């Protein structure tokens, strides 16, 4: 066996390694409006249309007078999606970003985050 054949065999063996496969455990979606009211309700509806699940409302941890936020006031909605639905939503999100992410989007532990300005880009009206 030559060196080239040996190297290609090693590459193929690495490619078949189960530990190199990407696995999506969960997808956490979050919309923070910063105030309670109509905008928060609309954000909850958008998240419900996107995931098919009822989102959970998040409360402010402490009062921030400059932003007009009071402690325990509902200011955001979030939802956790798992399984094939998570893969489908992630595919839509990456398509909006044109499958390009920065190195800074990834953490050392294998997580990554991305933001989408308009939910209409995801195919939700």
UniProtKB/Swiss-Prot annotation:
Domain of life where this protein originates: Eukaryota
Keyword Signal included in the entry's annotation: no
Main location: nucleus
Keyword Protease in annotation: no
Species of origin: Toxocara canis (Canine roundworm)
GO biological process: translation
UniProt keyword terms in alphabetical order: Cytoplasm, Nucleus, Ribonucleoprotein, Ribosomal protein, RNA-binding, rRNA-binding
Gene encoding the protein: RPL11
Known partners and oligomeric status: Component of the large ribosomal subunit.
PANTHER family: 60S RIBOSOMAL PROTEIN L11-RELATED
Family listed: Belongs to the universal ribosomal protein uL5 family.
Annotated function: Component of the ribosome, a large ribonucleoprotein complex responsible for the synthesis of proteins in the cell. The small ribosomal subunit (SSU) binds messenger RNAs (mRNAs) and translates the encoded message by selecting cognate aminoacyl-transfer RNA (tRNA) molecules. The large subunit (LSU) contains the ribosomal catalytic site termed the peptidyl transferase center (PTC), which catalyzes the formation of peptide bonds, thereby polymerizing the amino acids delivered by tRNAs into a polypeptide chain.
Molecular function GO terms recorded: rRNA binding; structural constituent of ribosome
Subcellular location: Nucleus; Cytoplasm
Recorded GO CC terms: cytoplasm; nucleus; ribonucleoprotein complex; ribosome
Record's protein name: Large ribosomal subunit protein uL5
